[in-house]
Design a protein with these regions (language model features):
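Acidic/histidine-rich catalytic cores and adjacent linkers
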Residues: 41, 47, 177-179, 187-192, ...
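Extended interfacial segments that mediate partner engagement and assembly in macromolecular machines
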Residues: 68-75, 83-157, 166-167
Length: 402
């Protein structure tokens, strides 16, 4: 290919001319590399040119505004029995009646769907109308497969809050509280959002699962959830054969909350006030929540200074050890290693002898079967959390965050 065609890089086309426009921008004239196409009626391939026509199409910007003109051949149908006499050549980049190149449509979809940009901003950036951009998005939504046709083996369920609580007045029932919670169901393998339901109770999740076909539900092997009794009830009711995997992020979050509550309680008991920056434990409160294996030598030294100077009873250090012990349980490579780490953790919990660590230990025991499933399958809710973040981003982009 010549240099201009290489730079323009429109698949199956080459540049035959390019000029500067008087009011700015450039006009690029392209033509297909090969001449010939099948008749849309009979399918017979023809290479006989009847006439040439020119069509202006939209394409992705190239270092500024570019006006793309396509030189198209109008071919003569070679089949005498066909009712169509002539037809215009089509390609993968310019299908029949297309006004935009295929790569422009792909770029629009990537900007709107993958990056969550507003339709109006994408239309302005690519120099097309809002209606054109929205039509591309609508066309992509139409071809999305039905949920029941997808082969989902690992399912992720998680809730997210999208606004504050609202009260609406029902003429028949009076004031009604509307919870700002929604539950997202995601294919853990691909990250594709399968459904979004109102609320975060078991009835909402059960209703969505029961609406699926029996064959679809039978294929579900593992469901990843956070430590939620409502989600657990919905899964055991609608998917009794599926195993439940508890998300490790939420367990570590509970361990960090346990440590934070111990720190806050100790400050109140010893100083009768809230923590201040003069207190080493408060000043290094985020350091206490970090994993010990991720700390540098300098950070570990600061951590030792916190325990030496601001932990007279040793309860803070004991709670920190329980938090790290739980992390070791979740990081265990095998089930036997996890059980051994759990036994060590039990000793640390008994030694700490605080209400906060005992409550954390009871939670771990209550969800231990789900922890075992996580250790053996490593199915987490990471993609579900990512989907929730994307949903919130789309709502904010659409000015729907109020």
């Amino acid at each position: 290919r010549d240099a201009a065609s290489v730079i323009f890089n429109l698949p199956d086309y080459h540049v035959i001319d390019a000029i500067d426009l008087p009011l700015g921008g450039r006009r690029v004239i392209v033509q297909a590399d090969t001449i010939g196409d099948g008749c849309p009626d009979c399918g017979v391939v023809s290479e006989r040119v009847h006439a040439w026509c020119r069509q202006r199409v939209r394409d992705v910007p190239h270092a500024g505004r570019v006006e793309v003109i396509v030189r198209k051949p109008r071919l003569v149908c070679s089949e005498r029995a066909c009712s169509r006499i002539t037809f215009t050549q089509t390609t993968a980049e310019l299908p029949l009646r297309a006004r935009c190149t295929t790569r422009l449509r792909r770029a629009i979809l990537e900007a709107v769907i993958d990056h969550g940009r507003p339709v109006a901003g994408v239309a302005e950036g690519f120099g097309v109308a809002w209606w054109t951009t929205q039509a591309v998005v609508n066309a992509a939504a139409v071809v999305l497969p039905d949920v029941d046709d997808l082969h989902v083996k690992h399912l992720g369920v998680d809730e997210h809050r999208y606004r504050r609580v609202r009260w609406f007045r029902d003429p028949e029932a009076g004031w009604r509280r509307v919870e700002p919670w929604m539950t997202t169901l995601v294919n853990v393998a691909s990250g594709q959002v399968l459904g979004v339901v109102d609320g975060r109770d078991s009835a909402a999740v059960e209703g969505w699962l029961n609406a699926r076909s029996q064959a679809w539900r039978d294929r579900i092997a593992v469901v990843a959830i956070d430590p939620s009794a409502a989600f657990k009830k919905a899964i055991t009711t609608s998917l009794p054969h599926a195993k439940i995997s508890v998300d490790p992020f939420h367990l570590v979050q509970l361990a960090n909350l346990c440590l934070t509550r111990v720190r806050q309680r100790l400050v109140q008991e010893h100083h009768q006030r809230r923590g201040r920056k003069v207190d080493p434990a408060w000043a290094h409160r985020t350091l206490l929540l970090r994993g010990y294996d991720t700390l540098s030598a300098r950070a570990r030294h600061r951590l030792e200074e916190v325990f030496a100077s601001d932990d007279p009873t040793g309860e803070l250090g004991a709670a920190w050890g329980v938090k790290e012990g739980l992390r070791l349980v979740l990081k265990a490579p095998t089930l036997d290693a996890a059980k051994a780490a759990r036994t060590r953790l039990e000793g640390w919990v008994n030694a700490s002898d605080t209400d906060e660590t005992t409550k954390l230990w009871d939670t771990l025991n209550a969800w231990w079967p789900a922890v075992e499933v996580f250790i053996t399958s490593r199915v987490t809710n990471a993609r579900t959390e990512a989907a929730n973040t994307a949903i919130k981003h789309i709502k904010r982009t659409g000015r729907g965050y109020r």
